[in-house]
From Swiss-Prot:
The lineage of its organism: Bacteria, Bacillati, Bacillota, Bacilli, Bacillales. This is Peptide methionine sulfoxide reductase MsrB. It catalyses: L-methionyl-[protein] + [thioredoxin]-disulfide + H2O = L-methionyl-(R)-S-oxide-[protein] + [thioredoxin]-dithiol. It comes from Bacillus velezensis (strain DSM 23117 / BGSC 10A6 / LMG 26770 / FZB42). It holds the Pfam family SelR. Keywords: Oxidoreductase. Residues 5-127 form the MsrB domain.
Length: 144
């Protein structure tokens, strides 16, 4: 899936730009997907690359969407983040190099990980719209 990063960045709203391009964080419990339960795919708002599925989403009570794992580990980069007087692991999209959020080791099993991701860094594609939106190759992820 080809994309024009410069054009896509111009189309972002203020919060999406702040989060993805300036490593910002949106307010907890006041974002689009923190309590979203619909079945589907969460893709990078900039590149459109599939990052997470609803199957790996869980309620971590932190106010941001949380996932146990990405669809493909190769699509996310992890970097040391020492901002704000903390030591954390930042999660960035590999293709667009956009800030997504952070990963912590306090998630449920078997991974034990919690990918705490800003809604502003994501676009949701409902399962029944995957083919229509060009994500037919991801339908197998939802087969039981």
């Amino acid at each position: 899936m080809a994309f024009n990063k410069e054009e896509k960045i111009k189309s972002l709203n203020r919060m999406q730009y702040e989060v993805t391009q300036n490593n910002g964080t949106e307010p907890p419990f006041q974002n689009e997907f923190w309590d979203h339960k619909e079945e589907g795919l969460y893709v990078d708002i900039v590149s459109g690359k599939p990052l997470f599925t609803s199957l790996d989403k869980f309620d971590s009570h932190c106010g941001w969407p949380s996932f146990t794992k990405p669809i493909e580990e190769e699509e996310v980069d992890e970097k040391l983040d020492t901002s704000h007087g903390m030591i954390r692991t930042e999660v960035r999209s590999k293709t667009a190099d956009s800030h997504l959020g952070h990963v912590f080791n306090d998630g449920p099993g078997p991974s034990g990980l919690r990918y705490c991701i800003n809604s502003a860094a994501l676009r949701f594609i409902p399962k029944d719209k995957l083919k229509e939106e060009g994500y037919e190759a991801c339908l197998h992820l939802f087969e039981k």
